A protein has these predicted regions:
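Glycine-rich phosphate/ribose-binding loops and adjacent secondary-structure elements
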Residues: 1-115
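C-terminal extensions of enzymes
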Residues: 73, 104-201
Length: 201
């Protein structure tokens, strides 16, 4: 992606291969009757669909998805918004904008208008405390709310009531190489057997 040096950019092993191996090795231990520790996957996760896929890919061993850069960005943007709206706070919040860009101004020109979850945070901390809450924190909360809602929608579509119910059968591979590397069924093979049973009944 946008990593500043080669080691992060192209010297490493792609996350999907590491995750596939982690599952493979955990499965070997489980088959021997050994307890497999709860695993977490990291590397490139940014949205609810990637969280869903990561948990399903490592199921039943993966219990946590770690996010780095993807979850930091709202905090940075929130700080930039705060710095643009309050010049006197710009240095303290490490804001880099002198003014709000047009893309933000289309939503509004105050925190209450810009942040979809402003009033949700206000309900938690109280109206008087909102003056002490950094805009980066409000933005971070807003992304967390989006991820929560999106994950609920994906789980509903998969007819699962909890992420602990996810299995590797809840996803399929988009290409043969990924299917081969991960052991996840290719999209042309997923549900093929049940479709043929229906057609031949």
């Amino acid at each position: 992606g946008m990593s500043p040096w080669n080691m992060m950019q192209s010297w490493g092993v792609p996350s999907i291969n590491l995750h596939a191996k982690a599952y493979e090795y955990a499965n070997i231990l489980a088959a021997k009757g050994l307890k497999v520790v709860d695993m977490s996957f990291a590397g490139g996760f940014a949205l609810e669909d990637s969280i869903f896929k990561g948990l399903a890919l490592g199921a039943p061993f993966t219990k946590l998805i770690c996010m780095g850069r993807g979850i930091k960005i709202p905090g940075f943007v929130g700080s930039n918004i705060e710095g643009a709206l309050f010049e006197e706070r710009r240095a303290a919040v490490h804001g880099h904008w002198n003014e709000l860009p047009k893309s933000v101004l289309t939503e509004g020109s105050t925190a209450k208008e810009i942040f979809a979850c402003y009033f949700d945070v206000e309900k938690i901390v109280g109206k008087d405390e909102m003056k002490n809450i950094p805009y980066g924190a409000i933005a971070f909360y807003t992304l967390a709310d989006k991820l929560y809602c999106g994950l609920q929608q994906l789980l509903a579509g998969a007819r699962k009531f909890s992420v602990t119910q996810l299995t590797r059968d809840d996803i399929f591979a988009g290409n043969r190489e990924t299917a081969r590397e991960t052991g996840i069924r290719h999209m042309a093979d997923a549900n093929d057997e049940s479709a043929r049973k229906i057609l031949n009944s």
